[in-house]
Amino acid sequence: MEDGLRWLPAHSHAVDVHRFVPGQIDAAVAGISDPDSRTIATAEALYFRGQATLAAKTARPYLDATDPALRYSACLICGYASLSLNRIADARRCLAGILDTPTDEESPAVHAMHILFASAASVLLHLPSPYSAEEFYPLAAHLPEGLRLFASYVMAHALYLRGEYGRSLGMVENALIMKQGSYPISELFLHLAASMACMSLKDIDAAKAHFGAAWDIARPDGLIELIGEHHGLLQGLIEACLKSQYPDDFARIIEITYRFSYGWRRIHNPDSGEDVADDLTTTEFTMAMLACRGWTNAEIARHMGVSPGTVKNRLSGVYAKLGIGTRAELIAHMLR
């Protein structure tokens, strides 16, 4: 690695630099020689396993680190862990710590990292990014491949939120095809984004294939946090692919979904002016998401392995909870 980038192993997804084999994340973390990078990687591993309290505790000492890689990583870990812990003020402070504008004297690599982390902090909350993709493109080559892959996820997620599902999928699949190394965490993000786009394009087989690839990465190390966080956007894939075959994992994932989404909405809703529903079960929310995308009750039933009557009853319950009467009204309460 070039001298100017020596600090970059301490980026978000630090363990990816060591290209660990799924099932060996602990060995990869233990093998990181720099103690600060190893601590951040430990916090990441804890976070991706759904251990928000320990992740935040481990990363917190680096919130004011002078090394921008350590600081940005700690802010993102603590910020998102705080959502699951319902510490909304802490989440806001940590995520705001990423948004400090870099000075002109900072290197292109640091500037690129700042744009990426600031964009991730916003886009993952479904809020406008403070930077455009065009501002990032000239600097992207200064990042190592693992972070460039994560950047592809962030940009693909932004395209998804704009309803550009084909472009979103193309960006993800191009990143996966063109990568040189193996970066499990970034690849997990990318496969989840591809699943989201495929579901919105109603290419269910492709969505399940990408979700299966994500699960193959996540399951050996118990990296279930991201799957739980993406629940609504995955539009029933978790239920269709995991509920019967992996009931214990499914239960833990749904627990993460409830915990994370509650905190997520407490920032997203007031900051966006939207009113994403907060009193639906995960099953109700999934069915409502699919209904908003134009799925019939019969299609929803086949996808989720239930009867059309069950779907009808669940959606009636959703309308009653939200005080609405039509699918057109439902859209205002769903994720984009």
Regions found by a protein language model. Give the residues of each.
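Small side chains
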Residues: 59, 79, 288-291
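Helix-turn-helix DNA-binding segment
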Residues: 265-316, 320-336
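Linker/hinge segments immediately adjacent to helix-turn-helix/homeobox DNA-binding domains
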Residues: 132, 147-187, 191-282, 298
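Tandem amphipathic alpha-helical repeat scaffolds
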Residues: 2-11, 36-51, 70-88, 110-127, ...
